[in-house]
């Protein structure tokens, strides 16, 4: 088994995924008016029917345990270029300026900052 395969298997571990999901849930639910619903099989958080965070656990076997969220206009390429191990362009919503954030690469404080900006 090559290193990339090992990395993907380790990252999609259910226990690790659940721990990250709890982190994200705690931050998202601290937002006034936040609601959690399942969307495409994953927890997604809304404020006034607007999505602001999507949880993604190994979406289409991509190896990421991440959140996808919108960023201020023009920030997506800057974040990805500056911190390529932390940020990536997610499928579907990346074209709209959203980023994926690798949850094992970001502190709770930094994650909360990005979620609050979303």
Task: Name each model feature, range by range.
Residues 1-117:
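Charge-dense, helix-prone N-terminal extensions
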